[in-house]
Amino acid sequence: MLISICMATYNGAKYIREQVDSILNQEFTENKDVEMELVVSDDGSTDDTLKILESYGDSRIKIFHHTEHKKHKYLNASRLCKCNFENAMRQAKGDYIFLSDQDDVWYPWKVDKQLSVLRRSGEAVRKLN
């Protein structure tokens, strides 16, 4: 089973390494059949966000550039963030999609536990923090 973790980024260099490390180091004890991809949509970062992401050299990290913000200068920040997440989700190939902010840090068991709840319940959508 493939899961996609979608992350929208914009000038997140200050925090992104800690978050990416916490995602790539997820432990799967209940769901041993899981493969993971980290789908990143960057909205034109001008700091080192992309350089940091590229430095991993990890095939699980897929980076996409979101350029819609250039067409929609009138949109507020929350709308632009939503569009950036949508771009990541369009690229996702997983059976399940998890959303990640660029400045979060996840517990090592987060995805495993949430995936177990989703599989047991049979629900397609569930908000789990």
Identify what each model region corresponds to.
Residues M1-N129:
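Nucleotide-sugar donor-binding/catalytic module of glycosyltransferases
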